[in-house]
Amino acid sequence: MGDGVSEERSPLCGKSATSCSERVRDRGTRADLECSLRGHSLKDIPVTSTSSPGSSKEEVLDSQSPGEADYCRRILVRDAKGTIREIVLPKGLDLDRPKRTRTSFTAEQLYRLELEFQRCQYVVGRERTELARQLNLSETQVKVWFQNRRTKQKKDQSRDSEKRSSSTSESFATCNILRLLEQGRLLSVPAPPNMISSQNNMGTSSGNGTSLGTSGSTSPVISTTPPGAGAFSLQVPSLAASSSPRLPTPFYFPGPLLGGLHEIPSGYGLGSSAFEPYTRLDRKDTASGKKSTS
């Protein structure tokens, strides 16, 4: 029965009767045969399409409208090896936006703006309009210049305050050191024991007591310069007079400068003195000095 149908409808096919019979043999169903014989459009017969893969890609790219694209611009770049690569710029990057130009002021304009800034740091209203007209500038340029100038002034003030604080801390430390020097806690060097014993002997023989005079306002030091050809006296200047009204204490270093200091008696309390290591010296000379005085 299928053969009869094919024979009746074969004139409709014309030259393609042989191809229709081949399709019937391949598919083996009547419905497929009827569908293949009904229409001869390009959609039903994709074999007759002559479009290449390259042309299909071009059609896909052309179908996309520039408004729907997710990129701003595509740039073809050829690298050193000769390979062409495509760089896709994001949509948020606006390359067509005009760049802002920097305003270059003349010397006369800067001089006038600086004068106005020294007079008033905030120029608004008619003053700004008049100043912009006189300097041949826009009000926006004048306003931005004043904003930048105020920012620069704040930075300079903060930098100056930091320098002042550092110098103040250094001067405070110097005053503390000088105060300790005046109080005799750093460089107070007592007289050698043989000199003290000679002064005591002279005081007892004359009956006037000891020759060491102490007052409530000064440190206990020798009032007269000790005899000797190599005696050296040092007086610390009072640079911290505003902080401490105490008078400077004279220090006496008997002997030559390069000869070194004499030993310090163990009974003299130095506390946190700079000469504390000298208290650990040998006490043989002190013992001999005591025997000579007795």
UniProtKB/Swiss-Prot annotation:
Residues 98-157 bind DNA. Residues 1-27, 43-65, 149-168, 190-223, 272-294 are annotated as: Disordered. Pfam families: Homeodomain. Its main location: nucleus. One of its GO terms (cellular component) is nucleus. Keywords: Developmental protein, DNA-binding, Homeobox, Nucleus, Transcription, Transcription regulation, Wnt signaling pathway. One of its GO terms (biological process) is regulation of transcription by RNA polymerase II. Residues 1-10, 154-165, 279-288 have a biased composition (Basic and acidic residues). GO terms for molecular function: DNA-binding transcription factor activity, RNA polymerase II-specific; RNA polymerase II cis-regulatory region sequence-specific DNA binding. Residues 197-219 have a biased composition (Low complexity). It is found in: Nucleus. The keyword NADP does not apply. Transcription factor that may function in dorsoventral specification of the forebrain. Regulates the expression of Wnt signaling antagonists. Belongs to the EMX homeobox family. This is Ventral anterior homeobox 2b.
